[in-house]
Amino acid sequence: MSDAFNLSSTFVHLGLGATATPLPDFSWSREYLDAYTERFDADGNEGRLVCLMPQEATWDSWERHPAGEEVVILLSGRVDLIQEIDGEERVVPLGPGQAVVNPPGVWHTARVREPGQALFITPGRGTEGRPG
């Protein structure tokens, strides 16, 4: 049994065997991400990172997740999620309660129209980024 925690500061790893591991000290530092990858390596492409992230400004980069589909659920605010598919940009406008699936390997970014929060369920293995 777990005590309540704030998902915006304690992310959760979903792994094989229907496990859910809270990550109270999660960090986007390279050192932490390398340790995270090693710790959950046995989950392979089935592992997912669940996080609640503020959407305060348009992203300054693009990312893609070759290991699987990413679910993005906008809880508040207004965001245009932009996917690059076959060299074309596809804009998916999102409002509160709306969701989108980023297919495996599809580059995506976000343009924030009204600040809010989004819930991400991400297959992190092999994630790549590039400048916006």
Model regions: which residues?
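A generic "binding-loop/recognition-motif" signal
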Residues: A67, V106, E114
